[in-house]
Every structure is written in C-alpha cells, then in structure tokens.
Amino acid sequence: MPAEWCGHSATWLSWPHNLETWPTKLASVREVWIQMITLLAPHERIYVLVNEERSADEVRARLETARAATENVTLLKIPTIDVWMRDYGPTFVTRSAPENPLAFNDWIFNGWGGKYPSYELDERVARDLASLLHVPVFRHDIVLEGGSIEVNGAGTCLTTEQCLLNQNRNPQLTRAEIDGFLKDSLGVSDVIWLGEGIVGDDTDGHIDDIARFVNPTTVTCIVEANSRDENYRFLEENYERLQIAVDQNGAKLSVVKLPCPDPMYDGGVRLPASYANFYIANEVVLVPIFDDAHDVEALGLLQELFPNRKVHGLRCNDVVAGLGAIHCVTQQQPQAAR
C-alpha cells in the first residue's frame, strides 16, 4: 500500500446528504466539500458520489460559482448512506503486475462495530467501484475500516488496539492473526500497535485521529497539554509507544508532537476534533481547524513537515459534529505505473 504522500491519480468523496448526521448543519458542511474539491481539483481528478441527479446539478453549480477546476471533477450516481469514504470505500494498493498495477482491498464494513446497522449498506460502495474501475479486487473476510490503518509506504503500518482488537469487529481473530493479516494485505513487514483513541471517536480509536506518517521515517502524534483532560493519559501512552517503536528496518522513528484543540462539544457530547485528521494530496495538505487557539500552531507545524506542499486549513467545526473530519471523508487512488 503506497503512503498517502505518494502521487495520486484521484481522490474519492461522497456528497453529504444525511440529515441524521447533520440535522442543522448540512448546508455549511456542504460548503466545506466545495472548498475541498476546489483546493484538490487543480492537482488531481476528483470523483464525487451522489445519490441523485439533483445533487449532481447542485454540485456542478456550486463548483462553477467557486471557479473550481470542474474539468477535473467527475460526478457519479452511486447511492450512499453517508460520507465516510475512508472507512467503507476501497483501500487501494499497487502491484508489480504490469497488466493490472492498481488493485484494491475490499474489507467488511459493519457500521463501526454494529453501532449504526443501516450504515452497513455502504459496504456495497466498494463493489460498485470495482465494476466501474475494472481493477482486481481482494475481498477479505475481516471487518476493517480504512481510518484504522496508516502506512509509511516502506513496510510499516500503524493501528490501534482499541479498534482492531475490539470484540465488535473480529472476535474470532487473535492479535497475532490480525497482525499477520495486515502484513499480507497491505504489503508491510511491521505493525506498530498504539492503544486508545481520542474521546468522542465513535469508531473505537481510529489511528487517523491520533498518529500519522508524514514521511517514511517521521510520524506526527497528537498530545494533550492539559493533564486533567480525559484524553491526556491515553495520548501520553501512545506517544511513549511511538518513542520506542522501530520501523521495518529496525530504526527508531522521529516523533513530532501535534497539539490538540480545546475540547469541543455538541449537545453535551464531546467531539473527536483532531488536527491529525489531515489529508495529503498532490501539492496540498488539507487540515481541519476549529476556531481554536491551537489552529495556527498546528498549521505551522504541518507546513514545516510538508515543505513541498501548501497546507490549507479548513474550518471543520460543523463537519466534526458528524464525528469525523477531512481524512475520514477522503480516499486516495494512487498512481500506478504500467
């Protein structure tokens, strides 16, 4: 599996429409999608899944108003329940086979451990894309979401115990079996296991809210400065694990701390706001920001870590009320050399 910073041929998104996810915020959430597409489209093709032609017309009109590079945007009528393409969409891999260098893994999606049974319908999206793309598909008898794995493209994968060892995913599998499965399906030789995710994350601790590779030897990890915050202990333990972890070559990683925004709530429920939920695309990095005092620091740190890309902050206060942000709703399709 290539690292996210490797060249993309496309980014995949689903157009927001679920009022249960955003009962009062759907209009502002859609504006963030327009911003994402506008920033990404000059650098790679953007595929947007829509439920109906009326939605496609709306997206086209809004992109034209935003003066987006619409020639690089393709709208596809493929129904979805919600927008979390990272988790239910295909996980692309590249291969040495010259006739079919691009393929993807199709995992079982069970609505994040059965929390949202109706969301299991989104498992069909990967199958729909398989018939559209005409690439080899590796279908696996394991529950897994794309947001639970992070790779450096050189042989190392990050994940969390809270998610992949959760009894609501694959209770029949041992840790060693899951470890071996990740190695086989992602083409990695080493798996680094972190512990717990952040409070408010209904995915049971996805790695893409916690720690992210920014190059083959460097990982950025969120830390909580307030020792009284409920995230403090979990994040300190994750940071300590990364400090002693080694990559596929047995070398220690460079670990860069990334701050946490102050706690955010919606209806009394804590939200999983995290600067680690950024998306690395061709030429740009899209970062969720939250009208928070730590926004500028986080953007500055990430710009230093990505000197050859332009880092853009997108206000995600309303998006994260749906319990996810930018990385959760994007899926990269890597370039595959023939």
Label for each model-derived stretch:
Residues M1-R338:
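The feature marks the mature, well-folded catalytic cores of soluble enzymes
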